[in-house]
Amino acid sequence: KGQIFIDMLSHPTIRKFIDMLLGEDYLLSSHSANIVKPGSVAMRLHTDQWWMPTPTRRERQPLPAGSMNRERFDVDEVPSTMIAPRVAANVLWVLEPFSEDNGGTLIVPGSHLYGRQPDSDAASVVATAPEGTALVLDGRTWHGTGANVSDGTRQAILTTFCTPQFRPQENYCLGTDESVLAKAGPDLLALFGYKIWNAYGRIESPMAEFVRPDEDIVRELYPDQ
């Protein structure tokens, strides 16, 4: 809600990290404030790509991917040496210092390679950081907001990106103001989901590079037309 938040999306250092983690094409999944108030309890450990099906045995019948939700995952009882690829990445912009007392983010180091959903009793560490820090996480990392037992708030901005095969948390094609779209360049339009990816997301021609909300579409045709 403002140019400063749009400018954050083109921060060169951050974008280099996201390019490295996700590749040439990716979408903005969410871009929002995270304010932890005094008395807030710790969040349950989670990943930012919990919806990603995990590898399973050929002879096993897995839970259909469309039946997964935040409380119901597919779990193969036989451990696998294979893990799901990284398809999401998260940026935590530290607006107020992160500490052990004010809700600094809890992280389980190395958990991005575990290949499973978080254990509730996993040992975590607090990502302490000064104001002005940006913390970049692999989307598979087990993490969660810590408890705020201090007298002050802990403010941050959370920005999540995902690869174009997946559905973003926020629908920027419908939720972006026209004034923002009118000034948006190719990079921002691609982040918002207006770029056609390998013929996916098109309205008419799969050869077009971008779609626009005001694009003319072919409507019902009649024999006399």
Predicted regions and their residues:
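Aromatic-acidic/polar surface patches that form glycan- and anion
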Residues: 3-10, 84, 127-128, 150
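Conserved double-stranded beta-helix
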Residues: 112-136, 140-141, 146-225
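Non-heme Fe(II)-dependent double-stranded beta-helix
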Residues: 1-69
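Non-catalytic surface loops within mature trypsin-like serine protease
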Residues: 37, 95-97, 161-163
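A structural signal for short, well-ordered beta-strand segments
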Residues: 31-33, 91-93, 157-161
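Short, well-ordered beta-to-alpha junction loops that form the rim of enzyme active sites
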Residues: 31-33, 94, 110, 139-140
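Catalytic core of non-heme Fe(II) oxygenases with the double-stranded beta-helix
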Residues: 41-129, 167-175
